Regions:
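N-terminal periplasmic "start-of-domain" segments of outer-membrane beta-barrel proteins
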Residues: 39-71, 96-99, 127
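Membrane-embedded beta-barrel scaffold of Gram-negative outer-membrane proteins
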Residues: 335-339, 345-361, 503-505, 511-517, ...
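Gram-negative outer-membrane beta-barrel transporters
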Residues: 183, 457-462, 566, 572-576, ...
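Structural signature of Gram-negative outer-membrane beta-barrels, strongest in the C-terminal barrel
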Residues: 281-283, 403-413, 439-574, 662-668, ...
């Protein structure tokens, strides 16, 4: 196993500096200096995306300042972990396959929610899985974030039907004056499960630099991450190989006896991210902005055997594999916006995301020889990517406070999949050999939409809207050695999605909002065409005959303002026809994933959210949520079984209960102490709910995880923090083994 000693030399300065910052002498000196040197700081509260665009959606948010106090964050997606009904399936620090689930959608359905950064789409709608369909979170550095808003449900006409889970809008900062920062993070996870016991470290370094000179503002950020993971998968079999001892007796997710023979997916990843943002004010009411982002990843993964022979030598079971990944991805966007706040405003945003290099080399031979080379495959996804164009206008015939505010727009996107896999005689260094499989195709969507916010009376507001979409999949091609090449037929579909929301505000403290929305979620190009083995070892099978999901969503939200807080209760229901649900199956040591249409599912429930500042005592902030969801399969004519049924069973990947609770105590403007808890009920991953055993590889446990963080602002330049995720060292599975107790340390300097 690779050396992952807990305190490598490059981290010693960070750890020493962090310890020094926490010493009483340093604190006393800094307090004296700050009293004389620190100017008064005025914090401007930014508005959410929903408020800016008058969108009729329930929205929960977190600002950069709040995240810095409360969240042990190495990557931007970490900042979402305490928002109501949001779970990012992140298996380890640096995981590039981290889809987001919501109150009605599962953790393996990346295309059922949307993630944007300043209007640039980060959701990889080339697939709907937890692999290459995962959002490109890594294109945003935590240090550039101003705020993150999560909008629940498909009630805004300006978003595609993929919004029926949620829309996450990341707003990043642009400077008004010179500013710069450097930050160092480190983390250590002590992991012990089956025959693997080790400490896995991660370290991150980031820097930002920005300024404004007249009409031009610019921002540059860079980020470097070096991380080691715990096992991602395990090798199992009904019995251990003859002549071997060791292994661990267990049961699979259906309760059958198995032996855990070894671990796979012990991953070392090194990632770099750089981004340049430019904005120019042509006039006080017209601004253009350009963003260019680059990300690269070099990762290698290996296996570990738990078996020995009578002499004590290692026995290597089949199923162990090594792989290396080389990735380079580019994003760019150009936007032009008017901001008169008069009768008419407009904006245009065009973006491109390109996977310029994406090579995964995987061994197929037997260990131990395969660790150093030999037969394998090379999967090449280079050339995959997407383009988007959005046009929007806002008409205010009676001004910003008039009876009508009409917004309308057009949208176009195209997604391209390129995914050949080649055989090679030397998996870690050889060139392409014979073509093994090939998957190609494109999808495109055109749409027009409109929305009218109509103030019926002083305390009544109605929002009417609709979206019409034209979709097609074309250029589909699949190749396999056994069957040869197949050109898939072109597929077209279209439809209208109406939206309606009515809000009643009888006083300053109460608001009642009823919303209804229809959404169409068209199949992704990957669901239709991609046949590939991912870096996680899972084979994903396509289905070119999939139908679009048709979603009817409704919500009644009741919100009451409190003194320095709020409480909200939401009743919601979601009916999905032709639900696209991914299933997994294991044949021998091979795990396969496939997608099928389910006739109808229904998810309905209730959500309670509380936020209160100065709760009980001054300086104590409480945030919490509790959600119950009854998620059921109502029809599934494609399921055939002599022994079981899927109708009436729970919808896969949606838990019955979820809860979060976060308490942050700020005795002054320097210290912030946070204790947080996250709970999720168990999940089912099969349509007939036969995965009765949760605590196993490919099972889905219920879990309660507690985290803590303490942050200290030393002076106007220096800040430091320490924290722990999973304080009680909860051992749990969400298909994969999830991180155990992890320690964090952070040191930051703002110029």
């Amino acid at each position: 196993m690779k050396n992952t000693k807990p305190f490598p030399f490059p981290l010693r300065p960070l750890l020493l500096a962090t310890i020094a910052a926490w010493s009483p002498l340093t604190q006393a000196q800094s307090q004296a200096e700050d009293a004389a040197a620190l100017p008064e700081v005025v914090v401007k509260e930014s508005r959410s995306v929903s408020e800016k665009n008058q969108l009729p959606t329930t929205t929960e948010s977190i600002t950069a300042a709040k995240a810095a106090d409360t969240v042990n964050a190495m990557n931007v997606e970490d900042t979402l972990k305490y928002l109501p009904n949001v779970l990012v399936r992140k298996r380890y620090i640096g995981d590039t396959q981290a889809p987001m689930s919501t109150r009605t959608t599962g953790i393996n359905a990346g295309a059922r929610s949307l993630i944007y950064a300043d209007g640039m789409l980060l959701s990889a709608l080339i697939n709907n899985n937890n692999g290459n369909g995962s959002p490109r979170w890594f294109m945003v550095a935590p240090e550039e974030v101003e705020r993150i808003d999560v909008l629940y449900g498909p009630f805004a006409a300006q978003y595609p039907g993929n919004s029926y889970g949620a829309v996450t809008e990341i707003t990043t900062r642009m400077p008004d004056h010179f500013e710069a920062s450097v930050k160092a993070n480190t983390a250590f996870q002590d992991f012990s499960q089956y025959g693997t016991s080790n400490t896995y470290r991660a370290q991150e370094f980031s820097a930002t630099l920005g300024n404004r000179s007249g009409d031009l503002s610019w921002w540059f950020s860079a980020n470097h991450l070096d991380s080691y993971s715990q096992p991602v998968t395990y090798v199992t079999a009904a019995t251990a190989p003859a002549g071997s001892v060791g292994g661990y007796a267990a049961q699979d997710r259906t309760g059958k006896n198995i032996v855990v023979l070894g671990a796979n997916g012990l991953t070392h990843t090194v990632q770099d991210n750089a981004k340049l943002k430019l904005a120019y004010d042509f006039s006080p009411t017209l601004t253009a902005a350009y963003t260019l982002g680059y990300w690269q990843n070099r990762a290698d993964s290996h296996g570990q055997s738990y078996l020995r022979n009578a002499a004590g030598a290692t026995v290597y079971p089949s199923g162990l594999a090594s792989n290396t990944t080389e990735q380079e991805q580019w994003m760019q966007s150009l936007s032009v916006r008017s901001k008169t706040q008069g009768v008419f405003d407009w904006e245009a945003v065009v973006s491109n995301f390109s996977m310029s290099k994406d090579l995964t080399r995987t061994s197929t031979g037997l260990y131990p020889a395969a660790q150093n080379g030999g037969n394998g495959t090379i999967a090449d996804a280079g050339g995959t990517g997407w383009n988007t164009l959005d046009l929007k206008g806002v008409w205010r015939p009676d001004g910003v406070k008039g009876a009508h505010i009409v917004s309308f727009g057009g949208h176009y996107d195209q997604y391209k999949l390129v995914s050949p896999t080649y055989l090679t005689s030397n998996w870690n260094a050889g060139g392409n050999g014979a073509l093994s499989t090939d998957s190609r195709g494109k999808t495109e969507t055109s749409a027009v939409w409109a929305q009218d916010v109509w103030r019926l009376a002083q305390d009544w507001k109605a929002t009417f809207g609709g979206r019409y979409e034209w979709w097609r999949a074309f250029g589909g091609y699949n190749y396999a050695v056994a069957s040869g090449g197949i050109n898939q037929p072109e597929v077209r579909n279209s439809g209208f999605s109406p939206k309606l929301s009515v809000a009643w505000t009888p006083g300053e403290q109460w608001q009642f909002t009823g919303s209804f929305g229809k959404a169409l979620r068209f199949p992704t190009v990957g669901e239709l065409y991609q046949n590939v083995q991912g870096s996680d070892g899972i084979f994903r099978q396509p289905n070119p005959n999939l139908q679009p999901e048709r979603v009817l969503s409704s919500e009644l939200a009741i919100e009451r303002a409190l003194d320095k807080g709020k409480v909200r209760v939401s009743l919601f229901q979601e009916d999905v026809s032709n639900a696209l649900i991914s299933q997994t199956a294991t044949l021998g040591t091979v795990v396969s994933s496939y997608t099928q249409n389910i006739d109808k599912t229904r998810q309905r429930g209730v959500e309670l959210v509380l936020q209160k500042d100065d709760a009980l005592i001054r300086g104590l902030e409480i945030n919490g949520s509790l959600t119950y969801v009854d998620a059921r399969i109502l029809g599934n004519s494609s399921f055939v079984s002599a022994t079981s049924t899927s109708v009436g069973k729970r919808t896969p990947y949606v838990p019955e209960w979820r809860a979060t609770l976060v308490g942050t105590y700020r005795p002054d403007d320097k210290w912030a102490y946070t204790l947080a808890g996250r709970y999720s009920g168990r999940l089912y991953s099969t349509v007939d709910n036969n995965d009765v055993n949760t605590h196993t590889y490919q099972g889905f446990d219920s879990y309660v995880v507690f985290d803590a963080r303490v942050r200290y602002k030393i002076d106007k330049h220096w800040s430091t923090a320490v924290g722990i995720d999973n304080i009680t060292n909860k051992d749990y599975f969400l298909f994969h083994p999830f991180p155990q107790r992890t320690l964090f340390a952070e040191l930051k300097y703002d110029f």
